[in-house]
Amino acid sequence: MVPRAVLPAALSAVLGLSALAAVTWPARESLFEQVAGGAARSPLAGLAGLVADKGLLALVVITACLVVFTWRRDRSRFGLLAAAGLGTLCAYGTSEVVKLMVAQERPCRVGEVATVLDCPPPGDWSWPSNHSTIAGALAVACLLVAPRLWLMVVPLALAVAGARVAAGVHHVHDVASGLALGVLVTCLVGLCVHAGVQRVTRRSTSRRSPEARRTTGR
């Protein structure tokens, strides 16, 4: 059973993040200079770089723990988490395709702002942010099976996205779009795949039941 509160929350998040991306697009350069430049001069520059580079691992660990827990305790929720995992892969693939189509250069490559992290090589495009896409996808995958974890996974996803801007490798609209993409695709694919598997399983079970065999004469 999918928690009812998750779907409206996910939709609201997608709409809010999309609006944030649209609003910040016109001021992307000044925002980048303020955030990335300020972070590079801040005593917290090292922390921003660490979260930007390795913060995604925390969400991976939480998701892995949920995989083990649901496999042992609740196979139905494990199935939903597995379907959401497929959605995460689809979200990442979509992000990569969009990157290649749009080919937006990294802000650290076109600007003159000192950044916390080294700028990725040419051809490693900026929009949307892959890290943010995966962060949003993993967060919503966890929330589909364990909504009480929102106080942990939502701040983590936002921290990863924000740190990518602070570290100087993305614009604000890059990470907002990435989060929205990860949440939307993972939610849609995960729920659709899980619902499809459940329908097939129910049909298969009903055909093998004694009542069904007596009805069909088998």
Predicted segments — roles?
Residues 1-63, 95-121, 205-208, 213-218:
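N-terminal transmembrane-helix/juxtamembrane module of multi-pass inner/ER membrane proteins
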Residues 17-23, 88-94, 157-169:
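Aromatic-anchored segments of alpha-helical transmembrane domains
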Residues 28, 44, 90, 94, ...:
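Alpha-helical membrane-inserting segments
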Residues 43, 75-80, 108, 146-152:
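Membrane-helix interface segments
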Residues 52-71, 131-134, 142-143:
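Hydrophobic alpha-helical transmembrane segments
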Residues 63-94:
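Interfacial segments of alpha-helical transmembrane regions
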Residues 85-107, 166-187:
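Hydrophobic alpha-helical transmembrane segments of integral membrane proteins
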Residues 118-218:
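Membrane-embedded catalytic cores of phosphoryl/pyrophosphoryl-handling enzymes
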